């Protein structure tokens, strides 16, 4: 019998009590010779990306048991960022990532599980589970709930998503009837919101890291093809267990699959597809769990050489995740990166001996396999539903146009530089990030006057009251991991700027973060954050700020002497908002803030503070 981790709780005379409890869960004598595989599900009725997951854990469990394993399912929490947004609920979103990571660790280690199937989907759930998987370093596979279908309405010539509903609601010229129609049409099915927002970005990145099956990031939640991903995940995790515990093959462990080169692959994919800036935060956090020295400087280096090969909402209106799938999904983007000489193709995945082998099999421009072509023709049905695998609609043709299609070749890239950039300067010594894919080229260099807000709430009030004018740079501070606490997303301020016609006339800088639905000159993750003594806390109303994306710089245009003098004064006052914020910070949030690092470290816990405990 292989030397399973689970033997700790299933073998030996002294474990009679534990075995009695295992038997009470349904285990038989023969089961104690099999690997115990944890299924970390994240079903909840609060989140459309998770509302359809209830029965899918048991779908995987049955396949695991057919393949020779023992499956035990548990649940994590899942916060819906869209529902939590715009009020104090958003304070809990990023901290929930740590709770999810810890809960997976607690369950897996407490019960000595041998492997994990992570059933994730939305914004903080995939990152939290990824952090746990790399922390635990036992066989793992990710299978997400899948993206939502794009919304359809006769009032728009393009597909709709959540952001469209938010923008139209803030547009005073839009009728109540139009707002209501957008609201009812924007989110028609179960699944993660239909654009290249944080959830879908992270689920795509699990493919590039080698920890998920092809199609994980792009196959619609409603499509029957997605059922096969869950079934295959169940079979694959048992095979990974056999290789690790039975054959001592350590190459299947997540830290050996998702190594430094794999993180580079994931980041290159993110840059090439113009993914959410939140992915930077989460990849940095996951790298720390894997004990990989991967940081913002690496991301900055990659951003300068990776072109943008894919554009999806919110960066362009005509394409959503269903269109990415039709164009060949993530392995077609990875294939383009490989042919451009950028991708590390020698790395293993949970499903292939190497990324090169996987691309040869799954890139629709490289294979004649009809089954693969059939798979990527899976499309939307346009029928509102909360049921997984409820339709089998197919596109008549694939989008294999690499000159003008959704996914491009190197020669026909949307832009020579990718969709994300890291900026440095005296206002953000440790860096800040911008999704350049969503920024009009006319404002890649922007000088403006600082308009200071001490919270997201006051910024929203100011924007809606027309206090922000053309040429302003909105500064929202004390919204970082420690200062918020919780590093709120700023989708409402950016959406309201857009609705006021200021999307190309203003910029926004914050030590908070942005929804994956954000576009415009929106710069987040300013590090160090204001609450940690960052220079963003020293900016005053009317100060000139220069943003220069081509040169990767952002600077407050005052002398070093003036900046130093302001720091002396701020040290005396303390690094806290000038105005009192009507914000209820609970004990749970205070505990998070106590250990939180700034965004350049992934907003993870400050482990140095814990080392002596």
Swiss-Prot record:
Binding site for Mg(2+): 81, 123-124, 489
Zinc-finger listed as a keyword: no
Organism lineage string: Bacteria, Pseudomonadati, Pseudomonadota, Gammaproteobacteria, Pseudomonadales
Subunit structure: Homodimer.
Name under which the protein is recorded: Dihydroxy-acid dehydratase
Active site feature: 515 (proton acceptor)
EC number: 4.2.1.9
GO CC term, one of those recorded: cytosol
Top-tier EC class: lyase
Cofactors, names only: [2Fe-2S] cluster; Mg(2+)
Family: Belongs to the IlvD/Edd family.
InterPro entries recorded: Dihydro-acid_dehy_C, DihydroxyA_deHydtase, DiOHA_6PGluconate_deHydtase_CS, ILV_EDD_C, ILV_EDD_N, IlvD/EDD_N
UniProt key word Zinc: no
Annotated residues for binding of [2Fe-2S] cluster: 122, 193
Gene3D superfamilies named among the record's database cross-references: IlvD/EDD C-terminal domain-like
Free-text function comment from the UniProt entry: Functions in the biosynthesis of branched-chain amino acids. Catalyzes the dehydration of (2R,3R)-2,3-dihydroxy-3-methylpentanoate (2,3-dihydroxy-3-methylvalerate) into 2-oxo-3-methylpentanoate (2-oxo-3-methylvalerate) and of (2R)-2,3-dihydroxy-3-methylbutanoate (2,3-dihydroxyisovalerate) into 2-oxo-3-methylbutanoate (2-oxoisovalerate), the penultimate precursor to L-isoleucine and L-valine, respectively.
UniProt-listed SUPFAM superfamilies: IlvD/EDD N-terminal domain-like (SSF143975), LeuD/IlvD-like (SSF52016)
Entry's cofactor comment: Binds 1 [2Fe-2S] cluster per subunit. This cluster acts as a Lewis acid cofactor.
């Amino acid at each position: 019998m292989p030397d399973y981790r689970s033997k700790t709780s299933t073998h030996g005379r002294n474990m009679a009590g534990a075995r009695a409890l295992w038997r009470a869960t349904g285990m038989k004598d023969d089961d104690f010779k099999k690997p115990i595989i944890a299924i970390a599900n994240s079903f909840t009725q609060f989140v459309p990306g998770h509302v359809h997951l209830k029965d899918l854990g048991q779908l995987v469990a049955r396949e695991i048991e057919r393949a020779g394993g023992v499956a035990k399912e548990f649940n994590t929490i899942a916060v819906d960022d869209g529902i939590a947004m715009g009020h104090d609920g958003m304070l809990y979103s990023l901290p929930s990532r740590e709770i999810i990571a810890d809960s997976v660790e607690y369950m897996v280690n407490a019960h000595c599980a041998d492997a994990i199937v992570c059933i994730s989907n939305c914004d903080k759930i995939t990152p939290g589970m990824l952090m746990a998987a790399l922390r635990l370093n036992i066989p793992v596979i990710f299978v997400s709930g899948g993206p939502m279908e794009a919304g359809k309405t006769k009032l728009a010539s393009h597909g709709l998503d959540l952001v469209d509903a938010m923008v139209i609601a803030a547009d005073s010229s839009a009728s109540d009837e139009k707002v209501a129609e957008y609201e009812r049409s924007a989110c028609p099915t179960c699944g993660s919101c239909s654009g290249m927002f944080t959830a879908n970005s992270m689920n795509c990145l699990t493919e590039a890291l080698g920890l998920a099956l092809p199609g994980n990031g792009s196959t619609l939640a409603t499509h029957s093809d997605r059922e096969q991903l869950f079934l295959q995940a169940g079979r694959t995790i048992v095979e990974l267990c056999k290789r690790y515990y039975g054959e001592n093959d350590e190459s299947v462990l997540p830290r050996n699959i998702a190594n430094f080169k794999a993180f580079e692959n994931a980041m290159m994919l993110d840059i090439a597809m113009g993914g959410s800036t939140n992915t930077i935060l989460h990849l940095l956090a996951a790298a720390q769990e894997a004990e990989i020295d991967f940081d913002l400087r690496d991301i900055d280096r990659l951003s300068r050489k990776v072109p943008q090969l894919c554009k999806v909402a919110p960066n362009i209106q005509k394409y959503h995740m269903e269109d990415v799938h039709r164009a060949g999904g993530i392995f077609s983007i990875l294939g383009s990166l490989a042919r451009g000489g950028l991708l590390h193709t020698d790395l293993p995945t949970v499903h292939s001996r190497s990324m090169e082998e996987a691309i040869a099999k799954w890139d629709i421009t490289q294979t004649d396999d009809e089954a693969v072509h059939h798979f990527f023709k899976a499309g939307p049905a346009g029928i509102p539903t909360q049921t997984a695998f409820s339709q089998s609609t197919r596109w008549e043709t694939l989008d294999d146009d690499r000159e003008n299609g959704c996914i491009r070749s190197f020669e026909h890239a949307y832009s020579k530089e990718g969709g994300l950039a890291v900026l440095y300067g005296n206002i953000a010594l440790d860096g800040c990030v911008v999704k350049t894919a969503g920024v009009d080229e006319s404002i890649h260099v922007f000088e403006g006057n600082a308009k200071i807000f001490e919270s997201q709430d006051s910024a929203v009030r100011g924007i809606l009251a027309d206090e922000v004018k053309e040429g302003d740079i909105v500064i929202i501070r004390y919204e970082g991991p420690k200062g918020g606490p919780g590093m709120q997303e700023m989708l409402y301020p950016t959406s309201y700027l857009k609705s006021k016609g200021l999307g190309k006339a203003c910029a926004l800088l914050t030590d908070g973060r942005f929804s994956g639905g954000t576009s415009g000159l929106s710069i987040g993750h300013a590090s160090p954050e204001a609450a940690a003594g960052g220079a963003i806390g020293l900016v005053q109303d009317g100060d000139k700020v220069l943003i220069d994306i081509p040169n990767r710089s952002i600077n407050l245009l005052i002398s070093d002497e003036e900046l130093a003098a302001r720091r002396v004064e701020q040290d005396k006052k303390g690094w806290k908002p000038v105005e009192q914020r009507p914000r209820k910070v609970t004990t749970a949030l205070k505990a998070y803030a106590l250990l939180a690092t700034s965004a350049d470290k992934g907003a993870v816990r400050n482990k140095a503070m814990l080392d002596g405990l």
